[in-house]
Amino acid sequence: MRFGSFVEFSMPDGGNPAHAYAQAFDHVDMAEDLGLDVICLAEFHFTPNRVISSPITVGAAIAGRTKRITIGTSVLVLPLSNPLRVAEEAATLDHVSDGRFEFGVGRSGFQTAYQGYGIPYSESRDRFREALDVITMAWTNDRFSYSGEYYSYEDVCVIPKPVQSPHPPIRIAATTNDTFPVNGKMGYPLLIGLRTVPLEGVTEQVASYKKAYKEAGHQAPMDVSLRIPVYVAEDREAAMTEPEESFMRQFRRLQRRLEAEGAQAVGSPSEQRTERAAGIASMDWEDVQREKVAVGTPEMVVEQLSKLREALHLTEVVAEFNAGELIPPEHIERSLRLFCEKVIPELR
């Protein structure tokens, strides 16, 4: 089982981008030293409290300051960029990291970035599929042509090709019910979360992925990664109370975003967002602790993650150590250290 840290490069209101980068890079350095397997980088656009609109660029900076840790995107929002350019830049990162890059991709469940770039969100699913096809063709063919609804290229040659053969590992994020069996049929590793869907629902979604994966005849073991807020402290009371304000801030912010998106969308997407927002609104801190986060002493977190591993067939856990962006730096460091030294060894 692998373990990682999700890094959003968050910046408080009125903060300094340079400080946000420095603080995040310090976290990456500590993760490398403590033996984490992977750093996962977000992609945010038009978001004042995030400074990671270009995760490939940030990944190259991380490659230059680390030697061992895998650098993953979680996720690159493929429909927002020209897929040829993504193929070039991702392959370049694979080179400068000496083959330590993992290509995590998705289409995002939110419309804000699409609106900013002038791309209809209704096109996101088909754009994503075309973009992924273009990128894999670019990596595995000397020259190629492609004709789709949104992207067309004639006899192009993408250089460099990735270091990893045939290409970096591709992991696809899934949140909607219909996406899971599609991903299972394709056979790509899966990235999931518990933020907007109850654990029972995610369990059913992963089961549909597993069924489609097996029916498609894939021989490799399934690979399922869970992103989840994590907080570890030696004292039980501290572990249960210290992250409450920050973690609940994240869920309330997500609730408001889903409500706003639900009001803008039409048809089933609107209903789904509104339903998920209502589900989050009904949850208090005790509810969140039960199935949305992993918090407690090292022993408690081991037990929580063990249950999730069993229910969701997990092969990887990516921890969010500062969900909500209000955890003090010294508490993040303590939580990360305890996670690496006392939680991970029990779950390997």
List each model region and its residues.
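N-terminal beta1-alpha1-beta2 module of alpha/beta enzyme domains
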Residues: 1-71, 165-168, 338
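Flexible, glycine-rich active-site loops centered on histidine and acidic residues
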Residues: 2-19, 79-146, 150, 189-191, ...
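Conserved, mostly hydrophobic/aromatic
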Residues: 3, 31, 35, 43, ...
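Hydrophobic faces of well-ordered beta-strands that scaffold small-molecule active sites
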Residues: 3-7, 39-41, 71-73, 101-105, ...
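Active-site mouth loops of central-metabolism enzymes
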Residues: 7-21, 76-84, 164-174, 231-233, ...
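Acidic (Asp/Glu)-rich catalytic clusters
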Residues: 32-33, 59-67, 90-101, 181-185, ...
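Glycine-rich, proline-tolerant flexible connector loops at the mouths of alpha/beta enzymes
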Residues: 38-58, 62, 77, 109, ...
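An alpha-helical appendage that flanks or caps ligand/catalytic pockets
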Residues: 122-158, 200-314
